[in-house]
Amino acid sequence: MRLQFFLVMAVATLATISATRVPDDANLQSVNAPVQTVTRSRRFLRTADTDIVYEPKVHNPGKKQVFIEDKLQKALTDPKKNKKLYARWYNSGFTVKQVEGGLDQNENRELELTYKNLALGYAKYYQARRSQEAK
């Protein structure tokens, strides 16, 4: 007989011997009865806050909803955020043409003016940084 078959038989024998147990060693946990006779003490209902009245949301047609365009326009017109964005673009090595090309790919007409102003701002920032590095 080959050594591989002998090893497989030895492992199988050890596995069957060690798998048998004495049922007295089992630790059984006690479980609650499936039929709940006294459920009143175990109920978790929201009966304590019946005095609080939650008003439903009312649709106000006069109030304009805030969409992502509004949030973007607000963020992109903030000078502090723009300088951070310009610095990140400059440190990443983007040229003015790359930034203009990337910002021109939008299909949103509401943000077109904001994107153009952002590209012009980056062009000014780019020229200023280039002139500082040239000195």
Curated annotation (Swiss-Prot):
Motif RxLR-dEER: where in chain: 43-71
Q: Key word Secreted present in the record?
A: yes
**Pfam families in UniProt:** RXLR
Example GO CC term: the record gives: host cell
Report if keyword Signal is assigned. yes
- The entry's a 1,2-diacyl-sn-glycero-3-phospho-(1D-myo-inositol-3-phosphate)-binding residues are 81, 83-84
Locations listed in the record? Secreted; Host cell
User: Domain of life here?
Assistant: Eukaryota
- What functional role does this protein have? Effector that suppresses plant defense responses during the early stages of pathogen infection. Suppresses cell death induced by effectors and PAMPs in plant hosts.
Domain remark from Swiss-Prot or TrEMBL:
The RxLR-dEER motif acts to carry the protein into the host cell cytoplasm through binding to cell surface phosphatidylinositol-3-phosphate.
- Report the protein name in the record: RxLR effector protein Avh5
Q: What is the lineage of its organism?
A: Eukaryota, Sar, Stramenopiles, Oomycota, Peronosporales
The gene behind this protein is Avh5
